[in-house]
Amino acid sequence: MLAFCRSSLKSKKYFIILLALAAIAGLGTHAAWSSNGLPRIDNKTLGRLAQQHPVVVLFRHAEHCDRSTNQCLSDKTGITVKGTQDARELGNAFSADIPDFDLYSSNTVRTIQSATWFSAGKKLTVDKRLLQCGNEIYSAIKDLQSKAPDKNIVIFTHNHCLTYIAKDKRDATFKPDYLDGLVMHVEKGKVYLDGEFVNH
């Protein structure tokens, strides 16, 4: 019972910290909460969260070539030239606050290309489990985090994965655009959704 109370207090303390950081972020140019009910976590807030514990950030891939009139980078199942530029811009902004992270993607051309342009040369590990978007993705996240418990993780995956996680963890309706993301963390073997990443 005592252990449970301590765990509960720790979780409440973390949630209060998250709310405070979100409120601080909300004093800037955007609201602290998205219309879907998820806390909005910008680059600076994410950097502060990462000082509390390692974070796991999941991004949808960049602009998909076969669903756009923009010029393709190469393979039609991959991303557009505009998508590469957007991914690189996002990566530069992200790395300014979190320079050290392990990088993963699902085994599709569009996620691999997005991660490659995002990272600007960082080692990428492709994991086919990140294409599966039920409870399997939680097992994959916990496994990746267990390999390097003190490292931040960036994962490039798909819109239906992000939609599933938001609904499952917070009963939120999340319809991610290209390169939209979610912020999570793993604590004592459980995966928690902290909020929606916003690039500001």
Swiss-Prot record:
Known EC number: 3.1.3.-
Pathway noted in the entry: Bacterial outer membrane biogenesis; lipopolysaccharide metabolism
SUPFAM superfamilies (UniProt xref): Phosphoglycerate mutase-like
Keyword Signal among UniProt keywords: yes
Alphabetical GO biological process terms: lipopolysaccharide metabolic process
Compartment(s) where it occurs, according to its Swiss-Prot or TrEMBL record: Periplasm
Keywords: Hydrolase, Periplasm, Signal
GO cellular component terms attached to this protein's record: periplasmic space
Bilayer-crossing regions: none
First-listed, main subcellular location of the protein, grouped into a coarse class: periplasm
Enzyme class: hydrolase
Signal sequence range: 1-25
MF terms in GO: phosphatase activity
InterPro entries found in the cross-reference section: His_Pase_superF_clade-1 (IPR013078), His_PPase_superfam (IPR029033), LipoPS_heptP_Pase (IPR011310)
HAMAP family associated with the record: Ais
Entries under NCBIfam families matching the protein: PRK15416.1
Function: Catalyzes the dephosphorylation of heptose(II) of the outer membrane lipopolysaccharide core.
Family to which this protein belongs: Belongs to the phosphoglycerate mutase family. Ais subfamily.
Annotated protein name in UniProt: Lipopolysaccharide core heptose(II)-phosphate phosphatase
Originating species: Escherichia coli O157:H7 (strain EC4115 / EHEC)
